[in-house]
């Protein structure tokens, strides 16, 4: 069964890019769109995050994977309703500090529009865009709704649109049913 084909609800704005980025590692099906430099370059270019389809370096690939792991850990804390682990926060902060974005103002329809632009191309630029998206999500209050599936075999990121903000599964039809059925069978075996 391929439960991760249904990623659930899309996150708002650039947080959706962050969700898709973390989900480049499909733990359930054993696929990784950041498996190597070529695959990572293709994924980032396809998402419009990599300037000029510029290939990334081995160090850049490691940094992208570290960012992905930190964001997945932070989203798991959202799922559990726990404080974010310091190690993940520090890893995120370190990567964001090394790969910064700058504020750019443009005239738009007689007014001014602001945007964040990465200072560099390649993996560093992609990290800057992703870090800026997380920053924006924290400011707008949408960050706490980005969660990691509670199925340890999946951990797919999803956007929790429930009123109570207590969703735990990327898909109730998939992971929710799988985990609940597993728990039921375990209880039956134990006789409780």
Describe each region flagged by the PLM:
Residues 129-185, 189-192:
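BZIP DNA-binding basic region
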Residues 1-148, 155:
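Short helix-coil boundary/hinge micro-motifs
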């Amino acid at each position: 069964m391929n439960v991760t084909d249904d990623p659930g609800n899309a996150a708002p704005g650039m947080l959706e890019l962050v969700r898709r980025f973390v989900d480049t590692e499909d733990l359930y099906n054993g696929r990784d769109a950041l498996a190597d430099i070529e695959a990572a370059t293709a994924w980032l270019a396809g998402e419009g995050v990599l300037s000029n389809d510029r290939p990334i370096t081995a160090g850049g690939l490691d940094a992208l994977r570290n960012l992905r792991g930190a964001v997945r850990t932070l989203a798991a804390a959202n799922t559990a309703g726990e404080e974010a682990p310091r190690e993940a926060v520090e890893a995120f902060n370190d990567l964001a500090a090394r790969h910064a974005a700058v504020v750019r103002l443009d005239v738009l329809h007689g007014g001014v529009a602001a945007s964040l632009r990465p200072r560099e191309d390649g993996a560093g630029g992609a990290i800057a865009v992703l870090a800026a998206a997380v920053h924006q999500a924290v400011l707008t209050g949408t960050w706490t709704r980005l969660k990691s599936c509670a199925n340890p075999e999946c951990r797919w990121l999803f956007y929790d649109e429930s009123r109570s903000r207590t969703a735990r599964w990327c898909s109730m039809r998939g992971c929710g049913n799988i985990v609940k059925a597993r728990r039921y069978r375990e209880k039956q075996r134990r006789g409780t």
